[in-house]
From Swiss-Prot:
Motif (Interaction with GRB2): 530-533
UniProt modified residues of type Phosphothreonine: T551
Low complexity bias (residue ranges): 38-88, 96-108, 116-128, 136-148, 156-168, 176-188, 196-208, 216-228, 236-248, 256-306, 345-357
Positions on the Extracellular side per record topology: 23-489
Name of this chain's protein: Mucin-1
Residues with lipidation of kind S-palmitoyl cysteine: C511, C513
Amino acid sequence: MTPDIQAPFLSLLLLFPVLTVANVPTLTTSDSINPRRTTPVSTTQSSPTSSPTKETSWSTTTTLLTASSPAPSPAASPGHDGASTPTSSPAPSPAASPGHDGASTPTSSPAPSPAASPGHDGASTPTSSPAPSPAASPGHDGASTPTSSPAPSPAASPGHNGTSSPTGSPAPSPAASPGHDGASTPTSSPAPSPAASPGHNGTSSPTGSPAPSPAASPGHDGASTPTSSPAPSPAASPGHNGTSSPTGSPAPSPTASPGHDSAPSLTSSPAPSPTASPGQHGASSPTSSDTSSMTTRSMSSSMVTSAHKGTSSRATMTPVSKGTPSSVPSSETAPTAASHITRTAASSPSIALSTSSNPKTSQQLSVRVSLYFLSFRITNLQFNSSLENPQTSYYQELQRSIWGLILQIYKQRDFLGLSEIKFRPGSVVVELTLAFREGTTAEWVKAQFSQLEAHAASYNLTISGVSVYSAPFPSSAQAGSGVPGWGIALLVLVCVLVALAIIYLIALVVCQCGRKKCEQLDVFPTLDAYHPMSEYSTYHTHGRYVPPGSTKRSPYEEVSAGNGGSNLSYTNLAATSANL
């Protein structure tokens, strides 16, 4: 951590036991050069300067006004009851420290905008009272007086009994927070806008430098929300007790962080002069400003984040304490206060920034259409080949004539248009399709055309043979019913394959039947090749097979005796005798 960041935490840790102590008039500010050194500043109460302005009341809380000094803004120590007086140097806007009972006004250092710490009883929220002028808070005897030291601006801690009063710059009326005795007078130093943290009891009004808009810290319940009504007074967001008044510097639009209860919006209050609210001990008189009207930035420069209720606004103001004769001029202020003003609230009504947009959604009208086919003959013209080509001049001229004739005849609201103009031989036969709203009949279409045939003379057309009949409305299924060429070829191929398969099956059946027929012929042969087994001898020896009924003897049955010269034969009796 850098010394600039360590200084506020160190001061808070050292002064934590004093948080419960009230009415401590000292305010510790951190030096930009030596951040570890703190200088106590005693509170000074001076008589408030009252101005003869119209008395109006703003129910606001402690305002934190930033000035333009180069030193960073110190944080007021907690547990102090005093107001920190801003010096003449352009100090940045102070950041309110939590748990403090006092208001601190920022000095003239141009440091970046301070952010009030969350969880404090102070917030930069505009209140909803319609009074344009800022009012000192009632019942409090504390004011912030500017000192001449160039120290950085202290940050008012939330829940403090003091107010930081802006002095007379074109910023309209800053309002002191309620419950505080201080006057807030706007001055003309351009300091960057501080970002008030939600839940703080103080308002931080940014000065008129083109510093970026403050953003409310997330997780806090505080924001300054301007009202969209033409009333000058800003409307305080719920749970906040402070206002931040926007002025006419072209600063970028503030954006509230998401998840916060704050919404940034700008309103312009037409009331010129700030006045002290009744029941308060001090009045805030604007000094050294030519205009007291609050200027609003353009609506396009501000962005509203949803779920936020706080406004961040900048004003060209330097804090001036009660009783100071005049505001201290800042070295970085613009030469004229009017140069920072872009739009005065006195001459223009309040501008409310609205984020909700209701774009008109175009409804698609469904119209039921009736189509009619119209045909008629043009007898004074002759058909030729040029009427077959839409690119020829004769075709286009005749087409324009028919269009003009149809538009003159059917001028009613129900007529939607025509299409598909065709010509064919027979003198010239014109065929076209007319579109009408549903409810039109073919008889009415023919009657209208027949009654107004006189219009055809203006186009040098002689019409006869008018016929009208209802045409079917083309559906998407009918439009896409055409079969492509590849589909037809595929279909033919499938048919051929099926035919071949059928032929093959027929041939296969015929072959099977032929085979079965051949087997039957073999079973019943023409030759008698069957012999009963009973006709064969069971066995025989030394002989060969002799078929039954054969008278020829086997040569093996005859046995020669060899040397005896006698024939010896052996006969198998079993084969020759049936008695065996």
